[in-house]
Amino acid sequence: MSLQFSVLASGSTGNAFYLETEDHAFLVDAGLSGKAMDGLMAQIGRKLDDVDGIFVTHEHSDHIKGLGVVARKYKLPIYANEKTWKAMENQIGKIDTDQKFVFPMETVKSFGGLDVESFGVSHDAAEPMFYVFHYSGRKLALMTDTGYVSDRMKGIIRSANVFVFESNHDVGMLQMGRYPWSIKRRILSDVGHVSNEDAALAMTDVIGDETSRIYLAHLSQDNNMKELARMSVQQTLASKGFVTGETFDLYDTDPKKATPLCAV
């Protein structure tokens, strides 16, 4: 038995993740149009009507843009905490009552042999949370959209086999870039986004003996580059004794191209 997943899209313009077991298939977020979501699923040889439900992280548009359309078209259950439901209801349109499920923060829901654990992050949304998936002794941890990584968060995601980890910006590029200071300050704040270097430092506290893959996610298209993010993370990890390519590898994500479906 295996848990498989793909980062369908990740970046400032839209985010969506897919995972499946032998018995179930789920999305985490649907931050692109319904048409784009169809196309991304086709890239990995899957269809949206194969999906059993959608877990929502928070109400920002780059995570829920296509949520209402996809859920209505395919009659999919949506799982989100109460504050996120209240914050996003006007954005996603009418959802039938029997498709609306409350998934409280810091709880676990089970779907067959798949255990889904929610945990809070630090972001400027109503009640943002991400997820850890446990299946057949394997662990997949998703965590983006957080201004910092607390010890509590580290304890929850520690020793995952696969991480999807925010590596949003290069601080120098952000500071010298075109954004107004108010937006720069928000991104750099404790409720903003994690930089390349801070992401790598957090990784050094959570990488385990069985960690095999780390996906660098939610890269800013204005304040980061794939090559820069990878180099910065590799250098910071190496300075702490973690050598990429020995026991684990780093992988890029893209706002328009899904990563290959792979086993956790």
Curated annotation (Swiss-Prot):
Cofactor names: Fe(2+); Zn(2+); Mn(2+)
Enzyme nomenclature, EC number: 3.1.11.-
UniProt induction comment: Expressed during exponential growth.
The keyword Hydrolase belongs to this UniProt entry's keyword annotation: yes
Pfam families, per the entry: Lactamase_B (PF00753)
UniProt-recorded Gene Ontology molecular function terms: exonuclease activity; metal ion binding
InterPro entries from the UniProt entry: Metallo-B-lactamas (IPR001279), RibonucZ/Hydroxyglut_hydro (IPR036866), WalJ_YycJ_ExoDNase_sf (IPR052533)
Family: Belongs to the metallo-beta-lactamase superfamily.
The protein's name in its UniProt record: Exodeoxyribonuclease YycJ
Organismal lineage: Bacteria, Bacillati, Bacillota, Bacilli, Bacillales
